[in-house]
Regions:
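N-terminal signal peptide c-region/cleavage motif recognized by signal peptidases
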Residues: 13-18
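C-terminal/domain-edge helix-coil "capping" segments
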Residues: 19-37, 53-56, 60-67, 93-97, ...
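Short, well-ordered secondary-structure micro-motifs
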Residues: 39-41, 81-82, 116
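Sec-dependent signal peptide recognition
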Residues: 1-8
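Generic signal for short, ordered secondary-structure residues
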Residues: 40, 73-74, 132
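Short, solvent-exposed, polar/charged sequence segments at loop or secondary-structure edges
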Residues: 64-105
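Glycine- and acidic-residue-enriched helix-capping/strand-helix junction motifs
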Residues: 40-52
Length: 165
């Protein structure tokens, strides 16, 4: 009998442990930073993939019901920041200046043509805190591997438990 009560309690309590959906609001998507540890002189392929990933993330956020704000009013400040994903909260200050509820930033770490790490941060501007953060390692430096990596990161880590767009 005690086993059945414990099992029933665990089943009813399980939803409390699940991630809650992120409340929808306005997002300042401030970009992705490419950290190329391989030291390639020509990183034009990666720059094109950063642009592709930026578009993919923006489309995903919009499809999930977030409203992306225009970041052009802070473009000059943004251009002076080396790594927007790691700037001691400057992304949240910029997002606040834009009137956004959240900031979204990311970082790509290229170790070699085979090994890359994708990081994405969703931060609550009012709370001045990380709301969600995810990282995935991908194998292969191709458009397809980057796209799959970000799709996995968004669907299974950042918005885990929420419907896929």
């Amino acid at each position: 009998m005690l086993k059945h009560c414990a099992l029933a309690l665990a089943l009813f309590a399980a939803p409390a442990w699940a991630d809650e959906a992120v409340p929808r609001g306005t997002v300042a998507f401030l970009g992705l930073y490419l950290m190329n540890n391989e030291g390639d002189a020509d990183d034009s392929d990666e720059r094109a993939r950063v642009a592709m990933a930026r578009d993919q993330i923006a489309r995903d956020l919009a499809a999930r019901g977030f409203t992306l704000v225009d970041t052009s009013p802070v473009a000059e400040k943004l251009a002076q920041i080396k790594n927007i994903a790691s700037c001691n909260g400057c992304d949240m200050a910029l997002a606040r200046d834009l009137g956004a509820d959240y900031s979204v930033t990311g970082e790509i770490q290229k170790t070699s043509e085979l090994i890359l790490a994708l990081n994405l941060f969703l931060r609550d501007v009012d709370a001045r805190a990380n709301l969600r953060h995810g990282a995935v390692d991908i194998r292969g430096n191709t458009d397809e591997s980057w796209s799959r990596g970000y799709r996995y990161l968004l669907n299974n880590i950042i918005f885990r438990g929420e419907p896929k767009p």
